[in-house]
Curated annotation (Swiss-Prot):
The active site is at 188 (proton donor). It comes from Arabidopsis thaliana. This is Coproporphyrinogen-III oxidase 1, chloroplastic. Residues 125-134, 326-361 are annotated as: Important for dimerization. The keyword Chloroplast applies. One of its GO terms (cellular component) is chloroplast.
Length: 386
């Protein structure tokens, strides 16, 4: 997630620059932005991103924001930064509380870290529980500096101004939940906010910002009522803001979670969006909040229904084969994961998305008409579930 040990940038699907199609060079300290600049369509920019090393903490702070962002326990700032941090930490709490309630005993292990110049994060992982094989829910707040080339790439146009290094802020919550029972689906969600400050030597330069995120699920077996329930909750959240959001973001999700070398999707989708700044900022903050608040009602009832179903070794083997696909996507295609691996990110946070166990069999093909085949067919040919 960050170029130097950032939980935020290495979370699944979470790289603040992901919307600008980062490509990676052999040198782990450099990145290439391939978003074309006006009048120079073939220009590939190379730049490094500077972020401080994290420091372990023994307690959760009230906020990870810098003092200059004007946040105190008695007077909460109205800034988008402050409210987004409040939202992602509340989302982390609500999801972890719901998971622990289902587990009936096992608790999340929590790691807290900060950086001397501001920012930090909370990583929570539950492993080998009663219901979940592995569950991770991470939040991060990151301050860093990008070079002027990155700033111009973010603006999407060339400029006569020659700004110096550009400060940026990024915050997000990211989670992957892998249940034990093969009839209970895996869930992934991620919501993030990115903002630049004006370069110090160009104080009038415009501030850039965008939102990204999504919620998607990956079952090993299709229960149509579960799929319809999950997608209906996503649609309800989207429809509160714009009726075009659900069909647009549902297709975006199907396209993003595509395993090219398999010619299939990772799962049965959900919603996904990135680089979203073409609406009112307050509206998008409310939208991201609504989506994050929809995670528990969309997912937990499905797990409650499926967690105690009887299953065979064949069912478990198929679940592990599908988790093999999950591993392939995350390590080969996921922008946040690959960014963290190539730039020295916090490895435990990067790999928290991977299942505890997975399986690969040579030339495995489910028999046509079986429940396993139906799942594979739906991953190859995305459907409209509602």
């Amino acid at each position: 997630m960050a170029s130097h040990s950032s939980t935020l940038l290495s979370s699944p699907t979470f790289a603040p620059f992901s919307s600008h199609r980062l490509h990676y060079s052999p040198n782990p300290s450099t990145l290439r932005f391939s978003r074309p600049i006006r009048n120079k369509p073939n220009l590939a920019l190379r730049c490094s991103v500077s972020i401080e090393k994290e420091v372990p903490e023994t307690e959760r702070p009230f906020t990870f924001l810098r003092d200059s962002d004007d946040v105190t326990p008695s007077s909460s700032s109205s800034s988008v930064r402050a409210r987004f941090e409040t939202m992602i930490r509340a989302a982390q709490d609500s999801v972890c509380d719901a998971i622990e309630a289902i587990e009936g005993g096992p608790k999340f292990k929590e790691d807290v870290w900060s950086r001397p110049g501001g920012g930090g994060g909370i990583s929570r992982v539950l492993q080998d529980g009663n219901v979940f094989e592995k569950a991770g829910v991470n939040v991060s707040v990151v301050y860093g500096v990008m070079p002027p080339e990155a700033y111009r790439a973010a603006k999407g146009s060339a400029s006569d101004q020659k700004p110096g290094p550009v400060p940026f802020f990024a915050a997000g919550v990211s989670s992957v939940l892998h249940p034990k029972n093969p009839f209970a689906p895996t869930l992934h969600f991620n919501y993030r906010y990115f903002e630049t400050d004006a370069p110090k030597d160009v104080p009038g330069a415009p501030r850039q910002w965008w939102f990204g995120g999504g919620t998607d699920f990956t079952p090993a077996y299709i229960f149509e009522e579960d799929v319809k329930h999950f997608h209906s909750i996503q649609k309800q959240a989207c429809d509160k803001f714009d009726p075009s959001f659900y069909p647009r973001f549902k297709k975006w999700c199907d396209d993003y979670f595509y395993i090219k070398h398999r010619d299939e999707r990772r799962g049965l989708g959900g919603i996904f969006f990135d680089d979203l700044n073409d609406y009112d900022q307050e509206m998008l903050l409310s939208f991201a909040t609504e989506c994050a608040n929809s995670v528990v009602p969309a997912y937990i009832p499905i797990v409650e229904k499926r967690k105690d179903m009887e299953f065979t070794e064949q069912h478990k083997a198929w679940q592990q084969l599908r988790r093999g696909r999950y591993v392939e996507f995350n390590l080969v295609y996921d922008r946040g994961t690959t960014f963290g691996l190539k730039t020295g990110g916090r490895i435990e946070s990067i790999l928290v998305s991977l299942p505890l166990s997975a399986r690969w069999e040579y030339d495995h093909k489910p028999e046509e008409g079986t429940e396993e085949w139906k799942l594979l067919d739906a991953c190859i040919n995305p459907k409209e579930w509602i």
